[in-house]
Amino acid sequence: MRKEILKKVKRVVIKIGSGVITSVDNGLDGDRIKGLAAEMAHFRQQGVEVVLVSSGAVAAGRLELGLSDRPRTIPQKQAAAAIGQSKLMRAYEEEFACHGIKVAQLLLTRDDLASRPRFLNARATIDTLLECGIIPIINENDTVVVEEIKFGDNDNLSALVTNLVEAQLLVILTDIDGFYTADPRTNPEARLIHLVRSITKETERAAGGSGSSVGTGGMATKIAAAKKVGKSGIPTIMVNGKKSGNLELVLAGTEVGTLFLPAGVSLNRRKHWIAYTQRPAGRVVVDNGAFRVLSQHGRSLLPSGVVQVEGKFDRGACVRICTPDGTEFARGITDYSSREMELIAGHKSGDIEQILGYRYGDDVIHRDNLVVL
């Protein structure tokens, strides 16, 4: 199965966690970066384009601040990132140069991908770099990011980048061998799972737990990333990045780590962007009838199905769509503002112009702009 998947891969996103290329005491692990660069160069030799999402800037910079552990405050984290990002890029630049490969740095915030024009511009930039034989190295712009525009962790960022660059595979390098039935660091009976056909609620529950002492992402964030790219029909392989040769085993189609198969029905790129990259500006609660036609029949949301509107947003905003009990089941781009939607909620589409004095259309959210989660 893996060999068949790898045959189709022409572009891969490789996410490297902090725990893979740094240590608690010594900052960056130069030997590990050297080994990974050599393995990624082998991908290039086999005709596979590589986009790298790398953590490690904060961990690389914290020693310069005299911190013995992961920064706990936002100013500390941003200062460590400002110091460490240049150290991280210099390490990659030196090791890839040994293989005749140039690298480029891209620092992103969520706003860069939530804005459709900036999303497309970022894609064009990365495509150009790849056409020139350059490996893009992407990280969150920790030096300026605030809670409202942060990705949360680089697992999430890697999933969004996989959609952005239209890769055929996401590889997540971590400091354990893959996905286990329990945390192998605390449970000696934990068993490695080589194949996950579908990410279920049970899978997500088994993934509970925190990250390493130098990173922010735990197993739960990695499962969430695999689920997101799976919605676009893209598989994920999670493997131990601290073990030399594992990346080459992945490329060869060897059963190493854990393979997460994609969902049966995949979202197109734009709907994936709506569902996972846009930051919702409000909430629209619908009645049970609207819930059924949206979730089961793929219809548009009409004003008659709207029960309540929460938040202030303009036309064209992304909103959460919820059942009467508050459970989110979909997201969509609105054709009306929150003020307009409040006025026409519960009314028939034919009444819109009489109520507002104008009319954009019959739907408050068109089915082409609506994604059931």
Curated annotation (Swiss-Prot):
<dbReference type="GO" id="GO:0003723">
    <property type="term" value="F:RNA binding"/>
</dbReference>
<comment type="pathway">
    <text>Amino-acid biosynthesis; L-proline biosynthesis; L-glutamate 5-semialdehyde from L-glutamate: step 1/2.</text>
</comment>
<keyword id="KW-0418">Kinase</keyword>
<dbReference type="GO" id="GO:0005524">
    <property type="term" value="F:ATP binding"/>
</dbReference>
<dbReference type="InterPro" id="IPR015947">
    <property type="entry name" value="PUA-like_sf"/>
</dbReference>
<feature type="domain" description="PUA">
    <location>
        <begin position="281"/>
        <end position="359"/>
    </location>
</feature>
<keyword id="KW-0808">Transferase</keyword>
<dbReference type="GO" id="GO:0004349">
    <property type="term" value="F:glutamate 5-kinase activity"/>
</dbReference>
<dbReference type="Pfam" id="PF01472">
    <property type="entry name" value="PUA"/>
</dbReference>
<dbReference type="InterPro" id="IPR019797">
    <property type="entry name" value="Glutamate_5-kinase_CS"/>
</dbReference>
<feature type="binding site">
    <location>
        <position position="55"/>
    </location>
    <ligand>
        <name>substrate</name>
    </ligand>
</feature>
<feature type="binding site">
    <location>
        <position position="154"/>
    </location>
    <ligand>
        <name>substrate</name>
    </ligand>
</feature>
<dbReference type="InterPro" id="IPR001057">
    <property type="entry name" value="Glu/AcGlu_kinase"/>
</dbReference>
<dbReference type="InterPro" id="IPR011529">
    <property type="entry name" value="Glu_5kinase"/>
</dbReference>
<comment type="similarity">
    <text>Belongs to the glutamate 5-kinase family.</text>
</comment>
<dbReference type="GO" id="GO:0055129">
    <property type="term" value="P:L-proline biosynthetic process"/>
</dbReference>
<dbReference type="InterPro" id="IPR036393">
    <property type="entry name" value="AceGlu_kinase-like_sf"/>
</dbReference>
<feature type="binding site">
    <location>
        <position position="15"/>
    </location>
    <ligand>
        <name>ATP</name>
    </ligand>
</feature>
<feature type="binding site">
    <location>
        <position position="142"/>
    </location>
    <ligand>
        <name>substrate</name>
    </ligand>
</feature>
<dbReference type="InterPro" id="IPR001048">
    <property type="entry name" value="Asp/Glu/Uridylate_kinase"/>
</dbReference>
<keyword id="KW-0641">Proline biosynthesis</keyword>
<keyword id="KW-0067">ATP-binding</keyword>
<keyword id="KW-0028">Amino-acid biosynthesis</keyword>
<keyword id="KW-0547">Nucleotide-binding</keyword>
<keyword id="KW-0963">Cytoplasm</keyword>
<dbReference type="Pfam" id="PF00696">
    <property type="entry name" value="AA_kinase"/>
</dbReference>
<dbReference type="GO" id="GO:0005829">
    <property type="term" value="C:cytosol"/>
</dbReference>
<feature type="binding site">
    <location>
        <begin position="216"/>
        <end position="222"/>
    </location>
    <ligand>
        <name>ATP</name>
    </ligand>
</feature>
<comment type="function">
    <text>Catalyzes the transfer of a phosphate group to glutamate to form L-glutamate 5-phosphate.</text>
</comment>
<dbReference type="InterPro" id="IPR041739">
    <property type="entry name" value="G5K_ProB"/>
</dbReference>
<feature type="binding site">
    <location>
        <begin position="174"/>
        <end position="175"/>
    </location>
    <ligand>
        <name>ATP</name>
    </ligand>
</feature>
<protein>
    <recommendedName>
        <fullName>Glutamate 5-kinase</fullName>
        <ecNumber>2.7.2.11</ecNumber>
    </recommendedName>
</protein>
<dbReference type="InterPro" id="IPR002478">
    <property type="entry name" value="PUA"/>
</dbReference>
<dbReference type="InterPro" id="IPR005715">
    <property type="entry name" value="Glu_5kinase/COase_Synthase"/>
</dbReference>
<dbReference type="InterPro" id="IPR036974">
    <property type="entry name" value="PUA_sf"/>
</dbReference>
